[in-house]
Amino acid sequence: MIDCIEFAEQAYTYRDRHIPYKELDCQAFVEKVLHDCGVSRNWRGSNHIWREALKWRGTYTEALVKYGCIPRGALLFTVKTDGGEKKRGYNDKDGNACHVGIFTGEGYGAMHSTTGGVQQARGDDRRWTHVGLLKDVDYHTDGLTDREMLEKILDYVKIISEVLKK
C-alpha cells in the first residue's frame, strides 16, 4: 500500500515536465503516478476508477465534513449527470466521471492532465465536484477523524446529561 504523502508528492513532481495530453490523458496520468509508486493498474477511464478503484467516494463537501479536509493524494473528480456514462457501458446512477486529478495538498492544488497536458490546478477549483480515496493508498483515515471523535464525545455528554437528570 502506498502512503498518501508519497503518492501526492510523486504527482507533484510532474508540474514542470510538460507532458502532452496525447501521451497521458487524465486516467493514464493517475495510473502513471501509481506505477511510479510501485502499483500497476489498467483502468478503462475515469468512470472505471470512479466505480471500481475507490474505498470511499463522495462530494467535495462530504469529504470536508467526513475528514475535515481533502486528504493529500485523494483523487478529485468532475462528475456530471449528463448520461455520458452510458456511452461508456455504465447503466447505473453513479454519474459520468469525465475527469480525474490528484490532490497534492493545501497550497499545492491538484495535478491533472487536460488538453493542455499535465498541469497544476487549484484544489478548490469548481471543476472538482467529487473526491475519492483509492484502495491502493493509505490515507491514515482508518481511525476516527477529529470531527468524528468530537461528535462521539458530544453524543456521550448528551447521554450522561440525560442520565444525571433522572
Locate the predicted segments by residue.
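Non-catalytic ligand/cofactor/substrate-binding and regulatory segments of enzyme domains
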Residues: 1-17, 118-147
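N-terminal capping segments
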Residues: 1-44, 71, 79-99, 138
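Generic secondary-structure transition motif, activating predominantly at the C-termini of alpha-helices
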Residues: 8-16, 54, 158, 165
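Soluble non-cytosolic domains of exported or imported proteins
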Residues: 20-25, 64, 147, 151
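Hydrophobic beta-strand residues in large extracellular and virion-surface proteins
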Residues: 30, 34, 74-76, 102, ...
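...with weaker cross-activation on analogous glycine-rich loops/strands in unrelated enzymes
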Residues: 39-125
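Short, low-complexity, charged amphipathic interaction modules
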Residues: 145-166
